[in-house]
Amino acid sequence: MKKFELYEVKDGKLVRKNPFCVRCSNGVFMADHGDRYACGKCGYTEWKNRE
């Protein structure tokens, strides 16, 4: 996936579609797996709310 595909434009501003990894640093995006976000670099996983 290309970096420009991870952003979208809303009201003239760039907005990230996926969060950054809290362990790695800014610039390392987490992958969206439906029920969770996962970092492919360090393996950190963040579960989405199940509401």
UniProtKB/Swiss-Prot annotation:
Gene3D superfamilies: 6.20.50.180. Binds 1 zinc ion per subunit. Zn(2+) binds at residues 21, 24, 39, 42. Coiled coil: none annotated. Belongs to the eukaryotic ribosomal protein eS31 family. It comes from Methanothermobacter thermautotrophicus (strain ATCC 29096 / DSM 1053 / JCM 10044 / NBRC 100330 / Delta H). A zinc finger (C4-type) spans 21-42. Keywords: Metal-binding, Ribonucleoprotein, Ribosomal protein, Zinc, Zinc-finger. The keyword Zinc-finger applies. Transmembrane segments: none annotated. This is Small ribosomal subunit protein eS31. GO terms for molecular function: structural constituent of ribosome; zinc ion binding. Its cofactor is Zn(2+). One of its GO terms (biological process) is translation.
